[in-house]
Amino acid sequence: PPMDKVVYIIFNQNKSGFIPLHADESDKTDQKDFFTQNDDFKCWIQHAGNEESLYLAILPLWESEAPERKRIVDKIISKYRPLCQTE
């Protein structure tokens, strides 16, 4: 989907709540297959079962620069250890 400058987290849900799978940041994009082209997409599906079981959280940061967004993503990764995170 089209997005402006954001930090995003992909989740799946189980009985105990939402499980973070992947966190990242993005500049503005109009790429419709932005998420499905992610290198970790197969891992997301393995954990969620199907695309419909994936959830997306977005933190809009319209006036931000990439280093600021990266700092936020690094904090998220450090605290929540998303299951499909690759660096």
Question: PLM features: residue spans?
Answer:
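A broadly used, surface-exposed interaction patch
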Residues: 31-50, 55
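Coupling/hinge elements of helicase-like and P-loop NTPase modules
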Residues: 82-87
